[in-house]
Design a protein with these regions (language model features):
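N-terminal Rossmann-like NAD(P)+-binding subdomain of aldehyde/semialdehyde dehydrogenases
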Residues: 1-115
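Conserved C-terminal structural/oligomerization subdomain of aldehyde/semialdehyde dehydrogenase
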Residues: 12-19, 201, 338-341, 345-465
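Residue-level signal for inorganic ion chemistry
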Residues: 14-16, 50, 72, 94, ...
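Short, well-ordered beta-strand elements within core beta-sheets of diverse protein domains
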Residues: 18-23, 38-44, 129, 238-241, ...
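Structural signal for hydrophobic packing residues in well-ordered secondary-structure cores
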Residues: 39, 43, 58-65, 69, ...
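Hydrophobic packing residues within well-ordered alpha-helices of enzyme cores
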Residues: 94, 166-169, 173, 195, ...
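Rossmann-like NAD(P) dinucleotide-binding subdomain of oxidoreductase/dehydrogenase enzymes
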Residues: 106-248, 379
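ALDH superfamily catalytic-core signature
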Residues: 211-360, 422
Length: 465
């Protein structure tokens, strides 16, 4: 750390380290001022004009796709095959967002009143997008596109744990957009706080932890006209019914808990398992998990990369040392692992818990794990599974594994989640649909046309014929 830079060491010390410029309060204010100055001109463009400029951004991103994918892997440890999928999803968001904007952002005629009327969807102003490290392009990019297409300007703050990715992404966007329309703001939490609390910023999209999301809600409570979209993660559950395809369920659970080393808001961190098929399912799960052996994330065959940082590695070790139940897959670090040289690689871990009260009081229940750790609980009857699911305060995703249509409908109707799946991993989240949670998982919907609702404010227009 120097007076002018903030040093960051990535997941594999000695491989990629860098220093990004420290942002002063004056720098943040200057970025906000440029964003505010650019807003009226950008908002005055037609939808077609904004879409045309954003299409150029899409062309730029496509041209840089492989370069950015490799950078994502080197900077965060995400396996290269996942990083490429992230870039493909980000590029696909252009067409999805354009199609949704065409349907939703046009003036809407409303009949049946005393006068001719329409609803106009108006931009809010400068918008802050706070992006996480685990999907350093894809997650912030979806909100960014929606805000920009709707006529807002964007102040983009990437995670400092993926600052290089954020820089290249910003360069791609800025190359096609007028000055001030897309501003890059690098820095740690105080920078994000200043950005979000500035009264000139009229919308905030934050992806991150529950404590920070709640703190933002409290801090912005008095500025009730500011739009706040929160995507705060989850404790995502797979419910395995007695008639489930167990091989399919085991592979889906293994994928859900291990993709991105469990560092996904929608990662599978819990299984509710019917007693009659428990032994068979757990045997299949252990076999499926053998696919996920930590290895070099730049290797095309690697499925499980490292955790992002030493602090995440330490937290993983603390969690698997708990006494909540029987660790049927014990997890741990690689025997050859040297934290100072080879990165923060860990093994998948599975704990079978019989004492639900002890579990509910433990960090395994109260906090996002953000590591490949799975809690398994046994149930005998459907109502018991539903009660146990609803005992936890998160509500992002859940998946029900059953061959019965009625069982899926019956159980699913009683689960408080924003995303419900059948016979799919909890990590399944196509960009065509709203993505977001209930309860502690937030209020944002950064997917499908739903996020456009956060990007605009409605104006009812009537006139005397």
């Amino acid at each position: 750390m120097s007076a002018d830079t903030c040093d960051w060491q990535n997941f594999s010390p000695g491989d990629l380290s860098y220093a990004f410029p420290m942002i002063s309060s004056g720098d943040v204010s200057a970025s906000i001022a440029r964003s505010s100055q650019a807003f009226p001109t950008w908002a005055a463009l037609s939808l077609e004009e904004r879409r045309g400029l954003l299409s150029q951004c899409g062309d730029n991103l496509r041209a840089k796709s492989e370069e950015i994918a490799v950078l994502i892997t080197r900077e965060t440890g995400k396996p290269i095959r996942e990083a490429r999928l992230e870039m493909a999803a980000a590029i696909a968001k252009f067409d999805f967002t354009f199609a949704d904007g065409e349907r939703f952002l046009r003036d809407e005629a409303v009949a049946g009143g005393p006068h001719p009327a329409l609803v106009r969807h108006c931009p809010r102003g400068p918008a802050a997008v706070i992006s996480p490290f685990n999907f350093p392009v894809h997650l912030g990019h979806g909100a960014t596109l929606a805000y920009l297409l709707a006529g807002n300007t964007v102040l983009f703050k990437p995670s400092p744990m993926a600052a290089n990715v954020g820089l290249v992404y910003a360069q791609v966007m800025q190359a096609a957009l007028p000055a001030g329309v897309f501003e890059l703001v690098q820095g740690w939490a105080p920078v994000g706080q200043e950005l979000c609390l500035d009264p000139v910023v009229r919308a905030v999209c934050f992806t991150g932890s529950v404590p920070v999301g709640k703190a933002l809600s409290v801090a912005l409570a008095s500025d009730y006209s500011k739009s706040l979209a929160l995507e705060l993660g989850g404790k995502n559950t797979a419910i395995i019914c007695e008639d489930a395809d167990l091989a399919l369920a085991a592979d889906a659970v293994a994928d859900g808990m291990c993709l991105t080393a469990g560092q996904r808001c929608n990662a599978t961190s819990r299984v509710l398992l019917h007693r009659s098929i428990a032994d068979r399912f757990l045997d299949l799960l252990q076999s499926s998990l053998k696919r996920y052996r930590p290895a070099d994330p730049l290797d095309e065959t690697t499925l499980l990369g490292p955790l992002i940082h030493f602090s995440a590695h330490e937290r993983y070790e603390q969690l698997i040392s708990g006494s909540e139940g029987e660790w049927i897959v014990p997890g741990g670090i690689l025997e050859c692992n040297d934290k100072e040289q080879h990165g923060f690689y860990v093994l998948p871990a599975v704990v079978l818990v019989n004492d639900s009260a002890a579990l509910d009081a433990s960090p395994l229940a109260k906090c996002e794990t953000f590591a490949p750790i799975l809690v398994v609980e046994i149930f005998d009857k459907e109502p018991e599974a539903i009660t146990r699911h609803e005992a936890w305060a998160f509500g992002l995703t859940a998946s029900i594994f059953t061959s019965c249509d009625d069982a899926f409908s019956r159980i699913g109707a009683l689960l408080s989640v924003g995303n419900l799946y059948r016979n799919l991993p909890t990590t399944f989240s196509p960009s065509t649909l709203p993505f977001g949670g209930w309860g502690n998982s937030g209020n944002g919907r950064p997917g499908g046309r739903s996020f456009l609702r956060f990007a605009v404010q409605e104006q009812a227009v009537q006139w005397k014929a």
